[in-house]
Amino acid sequence: MADDYREDDVVEEEEELDEAPRPSADPKRQSYESPATAALKCAYHLMQQRIISNPRDMIGVLLYGTKQSKFYDEDENSRGDLTYPNCYLFTDLNIPSAHEVLELRSLVQDEENAKKILEPSNEPVSMANLLFCVNQIFTLKAPNFLSRRLFIVTDNDNPHGDNKSFRSAATVRAKDLYDLGVTIELFPISQIEHEFDTSKFYDDIIYKASPNDPDAPAYLKPDAKMNDAQDGISLLNGLLSSINSRSVPRRAQFSNMSLELGPNFKISVSGYILFKRQESARSCYVWLGGEKPQIAKGVTTQIADDSARTIEKWEIKKAYKFGGDQVCFTPEEQKSLKDFGEPVIRIIGFKPLSTLPFWANIKHPLFIYPTEEDYVGSTRVFSALYQKLLRDQKVALVWYIARKAASPVLGAMMAGEEKVDENGIQKIPPGMWIIPLPFADDVRQNPETALQVAPEPLIDQMRTVIQQLQLPKGVYDPQKYPNPSLQWHYRILQALALDEDVPEKPDDKTIPKYRQIDKRAGGYVLDWADELEKQYAKITADQPKSTTLAKRPAKADNPDKAAPPAKKVKAEAGSGNIQDEVQKHFEQHTLSKLTVATLRDFLASQGRATAGKKAELLERVEELLETKF
C-alpha cells in the first residue's frame, strides 16, 4: 500500500500489498488484521487527524502491488500500455475533503469493495516504477512545497531479491526523489518468524539527511521493535504511534543565520523549535446563514467618523504623543526606530552552567545546528564549541536577533547531549540550545513559607507508596497522554465535518486509574494514614494545652462612672529572650516576620550597627547567625 500523506508540504506512505491475516501469538486473542488493512486504517486515522489539526496539508493514498491499476485518467480499460502498472492511486495528493475521508473509511470497513481493490498482483512490482510514479505525483501536485515526504509501510524487506538491475533502477529513482526535495521514511512491519532487515534493500534508497538541509538532524531510524506486532491490534497501534511520532517535520525557524564567536569570526547555523505548546486556533470564519456553511472572507474599511467617508491607506499616518503633542513618523522612520541590526547570534561572554537557574526557561528554547551553506567549516567550529561547553559545564551568553525588525533577546546558549531510548533510537539529537533569559519583570518573588519537615517514619512509608505508583521505567512519555481539551476540540470538528455522531464525553487519558492505584498502593496508603495519626497524636501530646478561659474583670463600685483606661506597661525583654526569639525565627526561615525594633535590639546586643532599612537589618542578622550559630 502506498499512502501519499502530505503534511505542511507533502507526504506519501507505501506498503506492498499483503492480504494474509497475521497469526496471533495468543490463541485466546484471534486477529484477522492483515498488514494492508492495518496500513489503510492507519492512513484513515491520520487523514482524520490532519484534516482538522492541519487543514492545509495535502494527503494522498497510493496502493501498489495491486492487480488493478489506476493513475489519473488511466485505468484497465484505457488504450495502450499502462504507465504505472500495479499502482492504484486511490486518493489523489490534495487537501482531503470529507468525501475522500469517507471513501477511505468505506474501503477499510467494506470487505467486498476491499477485495476488489486490494487483490494482489501476480507479478512482482518494480520499486523503480513505483518511485517514479511518486515523483510524478509530487511534481504535478506539489512542486513548490518545502517539506515533501514519502511514508513507506511494508513487510517485504527485499522486494527484488538478487535482481541487480531492478535494485540499481530503484536506487536511481530514489536519488531523483531526494534531489526533488522528498524525504523517504520507512515504517517496517516484522513478521513473527522473520524480522525486517533494512540492510537488504531499503538502506540503499533511504537517505539519512534532509534534502532541504543536509546538515539538519532530520533522519530517524525506523523502530523495528515498535512494529514487531504479533496481532492486528498491536500492529495498528504500533503504526499509529510510530507515524505520529514523526508526523510533524522539523521546520526551520531560521536558516543560515550567522553565529558570531568574535570579531570577523562567524559560522552559519539553522534554528528549530522542537518543543511548542499546541493549541486550538481559529483558521477562518464560517458563515452559517445559508443552506451550506461557507468560509467568510473579511474585508476591513477605514471610515471617517464625521463624514462617513472611506479613508484611503495613504491618508493614514501614525503618531506618538510626546509632551501632549502628536509627533508623526514616516514608515521609513518607524522601521529605523525598530532596527537593531541584522539577524545574528552574537556570543558576548561565558558563565558556569550552575549560574543558570532552572526557572529561567520561561519561553520556547531554540535548537540550533550548523550548516555549511554560507561558511565552509561551520560544522567543525560548531562541534569544537559544543564539546568545550559540554566538557567544562559552561553556557554562553548571546545577543540574539531572530529576524529583521525583531527585538533583541539576551539568551543562554548551552550544549545538549544526545538522548536515545532503550532501543538505541535517537529521540533528541545533539546540538546547542538557546534559552531566552527573562527580564526582572518576568520573575515573581516566591511567597515566604515556613519549612515544615515530616517525621522520618512518615517519609519512609510515603517512599513505598511512591515506588508503587511509578510509571514504567520511571519515565513519563507525553505521547501516551494527549491533551484532552485539544483532542476533544478536534473530535467535535471531525464529527461535524464527516457527519458523524457527536460523542457524549471526551476520552481523557490523564484521569488517574483509581482501581489500579488502589490495587497497587491501597494498603500502603492506609498504613501511612495510621502512621500519620500516631505522629499527630505524638506531636499534640508534647505541646502545652491551651485554654480559652479568661479572667473576668472586677466589677466597679459605681457602674455609671466610666472606668479609666488601663495603663499599658511595656515589658522589657532581656537580651537572652531576644536571642532565643531571633534564633527560633532563623531556624524556621521566618526572620522577615520580626519587627524592625526587635532586629535593632538584637544587633545592638551583638555590637553591630543598627542603622538602615529592614532589608539591610535582615541581611546583617542572617550573616551574623550563619557565622555564629
Swiss-Prot record:
GO BP annotation list: DNA recombination; double-strand break repair via nonhomologous end joining; telomere maintenance
Start and end residues of each stretch annotated as Disordered: 1-33, 543-575
Regions of compositional bias (Acidic residues) in chain numbering: 1-18
Amino-acid biosynthesis found in the keyword field: no
Similarity comment text for this entry: Belongs to the ku70 family.
Assembly behavior: Heterodimer of Ku70 and Ku80.
Name of the protein in question: ATP-dependent DNA helicase II subunit 1
UniProt source species: Emericella nidulans (strain FGSC A4 / ATCC 38163 / CBS 112.46 / NRRL 194 / M139)
